[in-house]
């Protein structure tokens, strides 16, 4: 809906004036992925929709965008005390006999090395512009061939995707649906947690 209404394109034009470099676009993706920690699926959908126009402008491959999004989604959610994962893990601990599941969950955050090291790795990759393995092929193709979607071995047709993007939107076409989704997600978590009963 956001893409079809043109909200993503409008945000991309606005953000393009603020974000001037490839590293800046990558850092902005990582920061936004860290800030939206309500749920990992919500994070992926939101950050992908919002940052795709910005990363496209700076010739960052979709593969790297996907990596940046995925590497901030679940790791941030599992260490954020206010997330769907915190509620799930805390309640599972309590059903397993732990007296205070949420308190125990919070105490385990410093020991969640996977999540913490993944976030450190994102910062390192954005800062050093290090690409390796298949990611290096995708990035090379994005930078030198202006092909954000594929590597030279597997070209991809993108006409269908481009036909779905609206271009007459405003930034509020992006902000209003995302803010509404955040508010209703928090209310839904509070409702499921029993706050309103």
Please describe what each predicted stretch is.
Residues 23, 108, 112, 167-171:
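Membrane-water interface of alpha-helical transmembrane segments
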Residues 5-9, 18, 58, 95-96, ...:
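Membrane-interface elements of multi-pass transporters and channels
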Residues 26-30, 63-78, 166-178:
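Alpha-helical transmembrane segments and their helix-start/interface "positive-inside/aromatic belt" motifs
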């Amino acid at each position: 809906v956001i893409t079809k209404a043109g909200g993503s394109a409008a945000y991309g034009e606005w953000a393009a004036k603020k974000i001037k470099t490839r590293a800046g676009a990558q850092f902005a993706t990582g920061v936004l992925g860290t800030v939206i920690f309500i749920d990992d699926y919500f994070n992926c959908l939101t950050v992908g929709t919002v940052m795709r126009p910005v990363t496209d402008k700076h010739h960052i491959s979709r593969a790297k965008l996907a990596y940046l999004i995925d590497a901030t989604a679940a790791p941030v959610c599992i260490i954020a005390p206010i997330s769907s994962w915190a509620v799930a893990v805390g309640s599972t601990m309590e059903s397993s006999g732990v007296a205070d599941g949420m308190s125990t969950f919070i105490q385990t955050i410093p020991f969640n090395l996977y999540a913490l090291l993944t976030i450190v790795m994102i910062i390192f990759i954005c800062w050093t512009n290090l690409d390796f393995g298949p990611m290096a092929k995708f990035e090379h193709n994005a930078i030198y061939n202006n092909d954000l979607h594929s590597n030279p071995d597997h070209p991809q047709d993108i006409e269908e995707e481009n036909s779905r993007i609206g271009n007459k939107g405003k930034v509020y076409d992006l902000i209003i649906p995302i803010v509404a989704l955040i508010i209703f997600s928090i209310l839904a978590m509070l409702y499921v947690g029993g706050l309103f009963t």
